[in-house]
């Protein structure tokens, strides 16, 4: 009996019919706290890594090696006043940051951390993740409109157009994964990558989807960078053009919620990419399978997050027209063609996903 099964059995004996509700709330709270800690230290890792790339030390003053810097940043934001513009629509202005951050948390309901460790193991998990992650754009649009600022509204319109453009390509990339796995359950998609000729010979990483579905993987990950408005696709909040975009009139914790949502979405994109294309919690080689699956998933997510940061430190920002051209004239045709190619591949005698 696993640790979770033991806790579940003991809780049922103590609380009876109330235990399932209590256990669900405990799991949600634990996941939320872990996500918040991950975001805090992801920001520190980003500042450290970019500092090293710039031949600097990065934050190193607060605590040993700067490890308490995230706590200092949170305290600073908590103590700042949320100043509301006089011409702003009060309630919409305050609700918009919440509408951005809630979907970012809600996606984690279906993301499995290892076999059996998921808040909600639903069959349409992939569809749920795509749908709920698309809702955040409404909060961005409302933030730009409610601020009653032309710069904020321009940033919000850019965000809406950019997110819609890249969601189409991202959706087709995920359709390819669904076709090969034959399911939308995220746990089953990971299981489908642990079978095949290479996996039977102990070389599991060659059975992962990244190899046969490489174009879809590249399109998904780059579209994920654009979806999160990260550099080099950060024209939504282009500092040299419209300052902070839709967040220009926000301060204090209201401003922090937008950044919280951005970094949570970075982790979501990396986690989904790891699950859909990099085998999730499976070890790259059979002889390493003694290491807990959650360790492998965390390592893969950390690697992809580091790529996010590396791209920010090395690439110049695209112009808005270049971003739209990349989404509609490059990524969309590539993913549509790849859907057709994989469809014929599955129907042919060379099908490797049987």
Curated annotation (Swiss-Prot):
Keyword annotations for this protein, in alphabetical order, are: Cell inner membrane, Cell membrane, Membrane, NAD, Quinone, Translocase, Transmembrane, Transmembrane helix, Ubiquinone
Alphabetized GO MF terms: NADH dehydrogenase activity; oxidoreductase activity, acting on NAD(P)H, quinone or similar compound as acceptor; quinone binding
The annotated topology with respect to the bilayer is:
Multi-pass membrane protein
UniProt GO BP: aerobic respiration
Q: Name one GO cellular component term.
A: plasma membrane
Transmembrane portions of the chain: 25-45, 91-111, 126-146, 170-190, 205-225, 257-277, 290-310, 330-350
EC number(s) for this protein?
A: 7.1.1.-
Q: Which compartments does it reside in? A: Cell inner membrane
Q: What is its main location?
A: membrane
* Recorded catalytic activity of this chain's protein: a quinone + NADH + 5 H(+)(in) = a quinol + NAD(+) + 4 H(+)(out)
User: Which is one Pfam family of this protein?
Assistant: NADHdh
Keyword Transmembrane in annotation: yes
Q: Which NCBIfam families match?
A: PRK06076.1-2, PRK06076.1-3
The record's subunit annotation is:
NDH-1 is composed of 14 different subunits. Subunits NuoA, H, J, K, L, M, N constitute the membrane sector of the complex.
Function in brief: NDH-1 shuttles electrons from NADH, via FMN and iron-sulfur (Fe-S) centers, to quinones in the respiratory chain. The immediate electron acceptor for the enzyme in this species is believed to be ubiquinone. Couples the redox reaction to proton translocation (for every two electrons transferred, four hydrogen ions are translocated across the cytoplasmic membrane), and thus conserves the redox energy in a proton gradient. This subunit may bind ubiquinone.
**Family of this protein:** Belongs to the complex I subunit 1 family.
Q: What is this protein called?
A: NADH-quinone oxidoreductase subunit H
Originating species = Paraburkholderia phymatum (strain DSM 17167 / CIP 108236 / LMG 21445 / STM815)
Gene symbol of the encoding locus: nuoH
């Amino acid at each position: 009996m696993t640790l979770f099964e033991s806790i579940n059995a003991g809780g049922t004996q103590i609380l009876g019919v109330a235990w399932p509700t209590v256990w669900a709330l405990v799991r949600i709270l634990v996941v939320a706290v872990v996500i918040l800690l991950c975001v805090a230290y992801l920001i520190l890792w980003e500042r450290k890594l970019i500092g090293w790339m710039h031949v600097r030390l990065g934050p190193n003053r607060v605590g040993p090696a700067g490890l308490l810097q995230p706590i200092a940043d949170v305290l600073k934001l908590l103590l700042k006043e949320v100043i509301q513009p006089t011409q702003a629509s009060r309630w919409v202005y305050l609700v918009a940051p919440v509408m951005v951050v809630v979907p970012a948390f809600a996606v984690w309901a279906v993301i499995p951390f290892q076999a059996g460790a998921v808040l909600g193991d639903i069959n349409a998990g992939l569809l749920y993740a795509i749908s709920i992650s698309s809702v955040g754009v409404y909060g961005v649009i409302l933030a730009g409109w409610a601020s009653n600022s032309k710069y904020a509204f321009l940033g919000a319109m850019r965000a809406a157009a950019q997110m819609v453009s890249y969601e189409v390509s991202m959706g087709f990339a995920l359709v390819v994964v669904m076709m090969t796995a034959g399911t939308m359950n995220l746990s089953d998609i990971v299981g489908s990558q642990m079978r095949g000729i290479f996996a039977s010979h102990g070389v599991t990483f060659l059975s992962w989807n990244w190899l046969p579905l490489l174009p879809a993987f590249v399109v998904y990950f780059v579209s994920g960078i654009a979806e999160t408005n990260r550099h080099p696709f950060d024209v939504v909040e282009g500092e040299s053009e419209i300052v902070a975009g839709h967040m220009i009139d926000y301060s204090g914790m209201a401003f922090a919620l937008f950044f919280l949502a951005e970094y949570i979405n970075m982790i979501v994109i990396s986690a989904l990419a790891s699950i859909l294309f990099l085998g999730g919690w499976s070890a790259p080689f059979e002889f390493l399978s003694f290491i807990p699956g959650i360790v492998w998933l965390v390592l893969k997510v950390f690697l992809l997050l580091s790529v996010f940061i590396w791209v920010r430190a090395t690439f110049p920002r695209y112009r808005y027209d270049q971003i739209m051209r990349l989404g509609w004239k490059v990524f969309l045709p590539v993913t549509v063609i790849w859907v057709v190619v994989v469809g014929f591949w599955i129907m042919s005698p060379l099908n490797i996903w049987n």
